Amino acid sequence: MDPTKFLDQFLGGDSKAKLQQAGGAAKQQFDRMGGMGGFAGGAAAGGLAGLLLGNKKVRKMAGGVVGYGGAAALGALAFKAYQNWQEGKQAASAPAATEADMPRTEARFLPDAAPAATGEPFQLSLIRAMIGAAKADGHVDAAEQKLLFEQVERMGLDAEAKGFVFDTLAKPTDLSEIAGAARTQEQAAELYLVSRLAIDPDHPAEKAYLEALAHRLSLPAELVAHLDRQAETGLSA
């Protein structure tokens, strides 16, 4: 299993670029599907994340992390948040990451920079974190899990990758396991960020989940605010 390829497949890869290359008809179809709720809207953006998160969250990701290359985009957002925080900028007015920032991302912020504290590829830790966050509101019911399993079968993943997704979906979310994957503050920031991308902060259960995760990751409140800012505004062009 190639962990970076798996993470990109999970996020939907460069679906935005593919839609632009396909022309107006494909984009119109995407827009129509995006107007539908739940899994239908999520499927329009491609990737398991699209199905898992549903329409309310995936539309943002389709223009950002999904649209600009998945794993590399996560690193760019985390690095921009970290950079703004270190420079003492106010989170509310801090500049958002753009496509031009991606080549300037420091290597330590890329998901493949180092293994997780547990020894597993850190890309798998990020996928586990996103699945856990998406389940925080309890919306992944048995019928939706069945659709996810069917989508996994269609994606051409190898047996190891399939098993990872199936096991993570089936078992209860363990915040200690998710937070325990962080070897460095950079990894902690990425685990929080990928979870924040899957969270609706207006939903009480999801907000509580995110606050608990930030606490477990020992992230400074100011850095958390910058990560929230990038999750909302980064790579949104």
Sequence positions of predicted segments:
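Primarily EF-hand calcium-binding motifs
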Residues: I131-A133
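Small-residue-enriched hydrophobic alpha-helices in membranes
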Residues: D2-R128, E144-A237
